């Protein structure tokens, strides 16, 4: 008797080698420079009686994936197709997808899809949309992309691992959900437009949308910003808000900077304050149980001002020294600075540390809302011997900051004055007091007093993300259509989703969006431009200008249809101030480009109709979606032609797009002479966009004497970033000789 195999459904049949050959040959059809026989030879399948067909299939997938290299990049596609074959068999029982209407009915009945899909759309509409789905677009994905779909995006039972759909079905359902409340006469076309944008990889959606829209859990904002006040009720309200959002797919930015430091008097001296270290540890521990539906670990970034009384205890909380009781290593930290403190550093002065509630909280308030008033009050408090304060040389304080940043890579910087001067919000009405997990969001917040009170004055800020794939852009005008469709879809999402915390519903009054880019490096490489070239600076200026112009144009169009957002009067746009009016002028020394768009016409349009959205743009990390769209990560220069990214399936080889193609010339991160040229491009982008940028610094230690990065270089670059107007600085990367690329923002939430 011959060898038998056991199929997924438990049945047993005779092993047929020809079936394996046919599948491998099929996976290579139409793909240049790949060999079915090489895949089969590498697989060396170990046959034995009763072997499971899934095991055979997994071996073939691994065999094809192991052949992926810079020399043979196209093995990405047979590996992806073999994995797709497996996923479709799991979802549909065979390779051909189930009819869409029957599939929706079945999956709604299983509790995996939101039932509004069958109440908002008729059977006839769904059957029509089924004819639009192009399942062959699944063949355009690389192996890394298909693994991301399997691991993060496809609706599945996260306990058993059972998959319920394939990529194109998921994308059509996302489009149906986001356009479900559009005018029924125009709705189907809007569904098709969004589906085509996403399925042809012109637009990239974030993990919460990709993994969540179409399911009954309706929370899709990537970034959540929570502010804690100094009152005990506010401290615990922040804990509860953090927990609710961390459990529902969001990354957390939490500002505890208003909380008094150690030994501050409570109730007129009845009690001494225990300090912020224990509170930060409590915040960290409350993240631990938030599973986020199996999609990612809960992650957070905690903010405080450099002049906080507890600075010396807080700045070391990320490092591996000290005891557990004095550390909270599983979160990141954002240190808030302004020009006043950089000037103290430059002039060799001192930094005085105060409790944030000093002067009835005015010092803390002015730190964000009024820079002149802050400097005046700070110096007045320094001169008053009755005010408790501690003191360090500015060089000592900044050196400690730079050392911790270098050792951990994850002590971030928020330049709060830039966040409020180059802002779409009026700082005296809606100041920016923190950022988010990945440092690209800058939105107003306010402490919550009672999380269950609908009249509470607290505000949790939310931002909903997306990115335009610049690899698909040939000319600047190509930006307009994907931008228009994306702004509409994300604005719809704000009304479509639920708000687990009442204070977050103020998002509906601001309607904040954060649309950015992915694949900038490929965009430049196709044009033969290096990050460090003057030509790249001018090209990025034109690109960023057109991008923001089209975003504002799209939001004006929505305002004409639906009205301006309710809190439009809190924006600088309502005062006639555009991005071209409020940026830091030093950036214009970095390029020679002239403005190309008709800003005065747009200014008039905004004055007449307002904007639907308080914010529209940001530049986020794109580690995950860059794999889906086969693009370079966001606005970052790639580390090399191939990197390996962690996934549940192991290390995924990821190649930059166009590698080896004639005329495609990349400038890789580790070939650059430090981060200066990259920082210049980021500053040019920051000139136009509403919020901030996940801007990194990066170093090769062996470029410096003794193979050690000098702290003065770290400080030089932080001060340079400030000088050219950057609002935030994210990771410090240090080359360790490996080509592994971690998934950056651990939660995956506020990145794409």
Question: Where in the sequence are the language-model features?
Answer:
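Core nucleic-acid recognition elements
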Residues: 11, 34-172, 176, 189-195
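Flexible, glycine/charged-enriched surface loops at secondary-structure junctions
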Residues: 34-40, 54-55, 70-78, 185-193, ...
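A glycine-rich phosphate-binding loop feature that marks nucleotide/adenosyl-phosphate handling sites
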Residues: 42-43, 61-63, 79-85, 197, ...
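Terminal amphipathic helices with adjacent charged low-complexity linkers/tails
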Residues: 75-111, 147, 337, 419-451, ...
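Catalytic alpha/beta core of large soluble enzyme barrels
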Residues: 117, 125-149, 438-449, 490, ...
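Function-dense linear segments that define catalytic or interfacial modules
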Residues: 155, 162, 169-187, 191, ...
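Internal maturation/activation junctions in enzymes
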Residues: 197, 483-504, 529-622, 694
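Conserved catalytic alpha/beta cores of large enzymes that bind or transform nucleotide phosphates
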Residues: 271-281, 288-398, 403, 492, ...
């Amino acid at each position: 008797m011959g060898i038998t195999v056991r199929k997924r459904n438990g049945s047993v049949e005779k092993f047929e080698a020809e079936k394996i050959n046919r599948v491998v040959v099929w996976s290579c059809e139409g793909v240049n420079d790949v060999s079915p026989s090489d895949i089969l030879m590498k697989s060396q399948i170990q046959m034995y009686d009763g072997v499971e067909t899934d095991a055979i299939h997994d071996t073939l997938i691994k065999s094809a994936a192991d052949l992926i290299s810079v020399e043979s990049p196209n093995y990405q596609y047979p590996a992806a197709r073999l994995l797709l074959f497996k996923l479709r068999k799991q979802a549909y029982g065979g390779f051909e997808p189930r009819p869409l209407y029957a599939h929706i009915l079945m999956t709604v009945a299983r509790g995996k899809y939101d039932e509004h899909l069958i109440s908002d759309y008729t059977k006839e509409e769904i059957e029509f949309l089924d004819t639009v789905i192009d399942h062959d677009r699944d063949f355009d994905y690389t192996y890394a992309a298909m693994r991301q779909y399997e691991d993060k995006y496809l609706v599945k039972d996260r306990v058993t691992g059972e998959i319920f759909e394939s990529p194109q079905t998921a994308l059509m359902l996302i489009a149906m959900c986001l356009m479900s409340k559009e005018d029924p006469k125009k709705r189907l076309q809007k569904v098709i437009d969004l589906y085509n944008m996403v399925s042809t990889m012109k637009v990239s959606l974030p993990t919460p949308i990709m993994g969540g829209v179409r399911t009954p859990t309706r929370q899709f904002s990537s970034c959540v910003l929570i502010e804690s006040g100094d009152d005990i009720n506010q401290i615990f309200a922040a804990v509860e808000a953090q927990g609710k959002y961390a459990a529902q797919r969001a990354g957390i930015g939490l500002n505890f900077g208003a909380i008094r430091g150690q030994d501050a008097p409570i109730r007129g001296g009845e009690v001494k304050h225990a300090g912020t270290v224990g509170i930060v540890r409590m915040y960290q521990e409350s993240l631990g149980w938030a599973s986020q539906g199996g999609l990612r670990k809960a992650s957070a970034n905690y903010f405080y001002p450099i002049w906080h009384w507890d600075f010396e205890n807080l700045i070391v909380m990320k490092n591996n020294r000290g005891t557990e009781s004095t550390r909270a290593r599983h979160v990141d930290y954002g240190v808030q600075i302004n020009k006043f403190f950089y000037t103290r550093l430059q002039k060799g002065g001192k930094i005085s540390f105060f409790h944030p509630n000093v002067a009835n909280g005015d010092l803390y308030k002015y730190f964000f809302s009024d820079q002149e008033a802050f400097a005046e009050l700070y110096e007045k408090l320094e001169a008053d011997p009755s005010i408790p304060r501690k003191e360090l040389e500015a060089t000592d304080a900044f050196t400690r900051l730079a050392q911790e940043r270098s050792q951990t890579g994850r002590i971030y910087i928020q330049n709060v004055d830039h966040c409020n001067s180059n802002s779409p919000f009026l700082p005296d009405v809606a100041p920016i007091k923190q950022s988010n997990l990945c440092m690209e969001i800058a939105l107003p917040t306010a402490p919550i007093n009672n999380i269950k009170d609908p009249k509470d004055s607290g505000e949790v800020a939310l931002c909903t993300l997306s990115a335009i794939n610049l690899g698909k852009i040939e000319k600047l005008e190509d930006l307009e259509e994907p931008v228009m469709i994306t702004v509409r879809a994300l604005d719809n999402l704000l009304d479509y989703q639920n708000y687990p915390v009442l204070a977050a519903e103020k998002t509906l009054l601001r309607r904040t969006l954060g649309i950015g880019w992915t694949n900038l490096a490929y965009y430049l490489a196709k044009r033969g431009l290096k990050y460090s070239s003057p030509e790249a600076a001018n090209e990025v200026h034109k690109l960023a200008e057109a991008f923001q112009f089209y975003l504002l144009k799209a939001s004006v169009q929505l305002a004409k249809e639906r009205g301006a957002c309710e809190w439009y009067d809190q924006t600088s746009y309502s005062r006639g101030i555009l991005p071209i009016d409020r940026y830091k002028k030093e950036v214009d020394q970095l390029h020679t480009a002239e403005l190309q768009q008709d800003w005065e016409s747009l200014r008039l349009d905004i004055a007449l109709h307002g904007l639907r959205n308080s914010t529209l743009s940001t530049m986020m990390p794109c580690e995950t979606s860059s794999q889906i769209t086969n693009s370079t990560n966001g606005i970052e220069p790639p580390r090399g032609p191939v990197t390996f990214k962690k996934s549940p399936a192991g290390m995924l080889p990821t190649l930059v797009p166009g590698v080896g193609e004639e005329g495609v010339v990349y400038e890789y991160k580790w070939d650059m002479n430090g981060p200066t040229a990259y920082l210049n491009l980021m500053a040019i982008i920051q000139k136009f966009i509403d919020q901030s940028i996940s801007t990194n610094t990066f170093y090769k230690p062996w470029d410096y004497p003794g193979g050690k990065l000098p702290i003065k270089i770290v400080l030089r670059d932080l001060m340079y970033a400030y000088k050219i107007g950057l609002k935030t600085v994210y990771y410090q990367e240090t080359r360790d000789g490996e080509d592994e690329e971690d998934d950056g923002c651990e939660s995956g939430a506020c990145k794409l």
